Amino acid sequence: MIKRLDSKYEKKVIDYLNIEKEINTFNLQELKNYGFDNVFYKVYSDIDEDGNIKGILFKCFEYLTFYSYGEFDVDKFCEFIISDIEFNEISGKTECVEAIARKLGLLKYRKVHLCRLDYIDDIEKNINPNLKLKKINIFNIKKVVKLYEEIGEFQNTTIESLRSNLKSGRGYCIEERKKVISMAKSTAENDNTAMIIGVGTHPEYRNQGLASK
């Protein structure tokens, strides 16, 4: 049956997520930040008769994230979502979310790529040395949002959402003529891993290695 989990399941959940820790970097960090006893953050799972996890559903405000290693009961999770949960968006491992989306009749979706960075090569070549990195802060955050608006791949980025993201990571940008032309952020930072997100360069300044810088 699907039920809300409490802290007694913490080790079992973390071990389950660590099977594919790169995919679950964000889930692991949110779980560490918010725990199981939180008004806006909840963790649900299908637990079989032997106590094994058969998929995990995270709810943070109106946003859902789903993960399963191996097979899971699509019908059971969809019935639970329809009957008990209000949400605006669901994300997660592609094959899992696609199965749920088909069942729920969700037609609008966007795929993103997840890559693992094993080492950093020489990234300084052919980059204008006069361009300096600046940390994203309250003084340039509006310029950063403006750049998001000018890049088609990004959707619905607001000052509030950007500020929220920066609470669990850092952001850097490059300015030219008082305009932000390239940016990158991190999130879900911990002692061992972090996610690099929100990487983008203005269309007129691409292929110069700016985002790599």
Which ranges hold each PLM region?
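Short amphipathic alpha-helix that is part of the acyltransferase structural core
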Residues: 1-26, 120-156
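Conserved donor-binding loop and adjoining core beta-sheet/short helix segment
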Residues: 2, 21, 29-83, 184-197
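Residue-level signal for inorganic ion chemistry
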Residues: 13, 93, 196
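A short, aromatic/hydrophobic, helix- or strand-capping loop or linear motif
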Residues: 23-32, 91, 154-164
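Acyl-donor-binding surface of acyltransferase catalytic domains
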Residues: 53, 60-129
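Acetyl-CoA-dependent GNAT
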Residues: 58-62, 153-193, 197
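Conserved acetyl-CoA-binding loop-helix of GNAT-fold acetyltransferases
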Residues: 72-78, 201-203, 207-213
